[in-house]
Amino acid sequence: MLLRTVILFALAAVAEIGGAWLIWQAVREGRPFWWAGLGVMALGAYGFIATLQADASFGRILAAYGGVFVAGSLLWGTVVDGYRPDRWDVIGAVVCLVGVAVIMAAPRGQGA
């Protein structure tokens, strides 16, 4: 189940961050406007991917995904745009990922 969660979060990040990046490229960087259309489709795919998580709590999934989004955005910027995160970016991303682990892996049940 953990592997499935990680894979779905990674796919969601690629769809959301990639979609937003495509729109950014069309609007801010002068790429063809059809890039924005592809971005909108990728953002729509992100919405569907989130529903595939095993946990039924929308709030929990989206809150945990937020941490993945933070780290994934920095990674995307580094790989795709040549952005160089500083130590505070990295520390912030690690804090977010620790939060993701707490939210998703905490033992839950009666009295939790």
From Swiss-Prot:
Residues spanning the membrane: 6-26, 32-52, 61-81, 87-107
Keyword tags: Cell membrane, Membrane, Transmembrane, Transmembrane helix
InterPro entries listed in its UniProt record: UPF0060
Any single Gene Ontology cellular-component annotation: plasma membrane
Keyword Membrane: yes
Domain of life where this protein originates: Bacteria
Recorded topology in the membrane: Multi-pass membrane protein
Compartments, as annotated in UniProt: Cell membrane
Pfam families: UPF0060
Keyword flag Chloroplast: no
NCBIfam families hit by this protein: PRK02237.1
Family, similarity comment: Belongs to the UPF0060 family.
Name the record gives this protein: UPF0060 membrane protein CMS0846
